[in-house]
Amino acid sequence: MSEEKRKQHFVLVHGACHGAWCWYKVKPLLEALGHRVTALDLAASGIDTTRSITDISTCEQYSEPLMQLMTSLPNDEKVVLVGHSFGGLSLALAMDKFPDKISVSVFVTAFMPDTKHSPSFVEEKFASSMTPEGWMGSELETYGSDNSGLSVFFSTDFMKHRLYQLSPVEDLELGLLLKRPSSLFINELSKMENFSEKGYGSVPRAYIVCKEDNIISEDHQRWMIHNYPANLVIEMEETDHMPMFCKPQLLSDHLLAIADNFC
């Protein structure tokens, strides 16, 4: 295979309350090796000032920028999808709709659903383990005409101690400056049809376990892998919930190795 053919298109999808900006360390590392990299702001995230989270009622609306990108790809192009944290649900939506346009999907300490339960199942399991104290003062508010939506806005303490505890303080400060309210869309996802084996289930999946994650714990990550086994599992030692800040070079190396394995 020629060097040119080995060049990949990585699509990077952020988690809740974050934006495309959180990939600022990983993106140039991949691009320096000649790969194409697209980092997206999902709806009402990052620098998308056209909407706020209270304008978004479904995960599909929230994920629309990713869906638009996938639609725009030529039929003969396949991408490497990379989703962090809640971004795993956006990946699953894209995988279910565009399985033929994805070489592999990489779940980076991310919610990874299955095909036997509702799309919200792995989130519900996570939410059941969270106490009010566990949110450390984060703002959770209902919204929508029937109050079925639930927005979340991470507190400083939550980000410092549960997300960024091993990451550089400069990146924590960046996150505190740029964070925006988001949603996990649990109620809405619980009413959706299951993801399909023909769509979502047909795309190869890799999972990157972050062993010092203080929010999506290693136990929960491994439970999701046991619940719906990934094709490849990679562990990152001494890594918090934000590996793109904590260990960007190692994360980039893992993404390249995964792409080499599946593309």
From Swiss-Prot:
Involved pathway(s): Plant hormone biosynthesis; Lipid metabolism; oxylipin biosynthesis
Enzyme Commission number(s) of this protein: 3.1.1.-
Species this protein is from: Arabidopsis thaliana
Classification via PANTHER family: METHYLESTERASE 2-RELATED (PTHR10992:SF1081), METHYLESTERASE FAMILY MEMBER (PTHR10992)
One cellular component (GO) term of this entry: cytosol
Keywords: Hydrolase
Gene3D superfamilies: alpha/beta hydrolase (3.40.50.1820)
Function (record text): Methylesterase shown to have carboxylesterase activity, methyl indole-3-acetic acid (MeIAA) esterase activity, methyl salicylate (MeSA) esterase activity and methyl jasmonate (MeJA) esterase activity in vitro.
Name used for this protein in its record: Methylesterase 2
